[in-house]
Amino acid sequence: MTAAYYKTEMEFFVDMQRCIGCKACEAACAECETNGQQSMIHVNYVERAVTIQTTVQVCMHCDDPVCANVCPADAISKDEFGVVHTANTARCIGCSNCVMACPFGVPFKEEKYDMMMKCNMCYDRTSAGKKPMCATVCPSQALYYGTREEMRQMRPNSVPVNTFQFGKLEVKTKVNIMMPAGSTMLKVD
């Protein structure tokens, strides 16, 4: 894959504390011509004792993608920029191994096409030097595509974390979650 304009210093950041649940990201993602009018990002509402927390579910683009590792058809690939691409339509057999294996619960099987679909970080845009659609429309900047230095200046009390612990499994990702200063890892029980 050639991406003459892909900017390697750019990273994707998710700040759950800033998400207002407006779903502008979902609408923008669904409008992308590569998604078949499906959103590859999802806003979830988690009921708390007296409030509702919104969470954003997006592909984390793992350094060692479990979805690709369990694919018997070798349909899922990771490129030299760390982007884990959605299943190759000519190879995907629709087995759903990737759907069941992803620790973040991101890939889904599109029954209409009998294949796996997921976010590819708007590769058609990012490889041309543009931002992913979801990050361009987020009014609260809960989704941000930029440099670590920009993020440091914008959020001095937070740090980007891209290491997650699921039991004994440690997963490193291309996408960062903003956490309180001093955090180095997010443990998911």
Where are these regions (language model features)?
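Non-ligating segments of multi-cofactor redox enzymes
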Residues: M1-D189
